[in-house]
Amino acid sequence: MSFKLFDKWDVTEVTVEDMGLQNYVCLDEIVVPHTMGRHVKRQFAKSKVSIVERLMNKIMRTERNSGKKNKAYSIVEDALEIINNKTKQNPVQVLVKAVENTAPREETTRIKYGGIGYQIAVDIAPQRRVDLSLGFITKGAMQSAFKNKKSAAQCLADEILLASDEDSRSFAVQKKEEKERVARSAH
């Protein structure tokens, strides 16, 4: 028996093309993306949580949406519906493509030699790449929805569509490029 996400979209046909992210973008067949936090007690267990639920959890991070899972659920469901209507593609595939396109590969970290701090470029772990990508997407969507006539779902759908096309108007793509540019300058 095959389950469809929100009883609408089949996740078995979704592919992750970035080899580094394949083990960290979970595409399990579930109807309702809500694990009730079962993963929080085990390290790295969040990589086994559906990418759609992780997107919902990132939406709940802001102080205005803290703990409002039903609100995040409806925002994500409506955004996926808007993406499906605009592109006629599986919206989960569009989301995965957006995550791949906005996941930075390098960042800087601070080290101290002899009391002097230096910034050095380091590669980012795949788990952190997915986390940063989802954070950039949701932050861009929520910032554009604030004091705007467009709904949060519409802004999230727009951000995901722009990010999946690697459009420079996307907040997430801008943040990724900024992070990688800073890392390149630290070489």
From Swiss-Prot:
One cellular component term from this protein's GO annotations in UniProt: small ribosomal subunit
PROSITE patterns to which the protein is assigned, alphabetical: RIBOSOMAL_S7
Pfam family, one: Ribosomal_S7
Keywords of this entry: Ribonucleoprotein, Ribosomal protein, RNA-binding, rRNA-binding
UniProt entry tagged with the keyword Hydrolase: no
InterPro entries recorded: Ribosomal_uS7, Ribosomal_uS7_arc, Ribosomal_uS7_CS, Ribosomal_uS7_dom, Ribosomal_uS7_dom_sf, Ribosomal_uS7_euk/arc
A molecular function GO annotation: structural constituent of ribosome
Subunit structure: Part of the 30S ribosomal subunit.
Family named by the database record: Belongs to the universal ribosomal protein uS7 family.
Protein name per the record: Small ribosomal subunit protein uS7
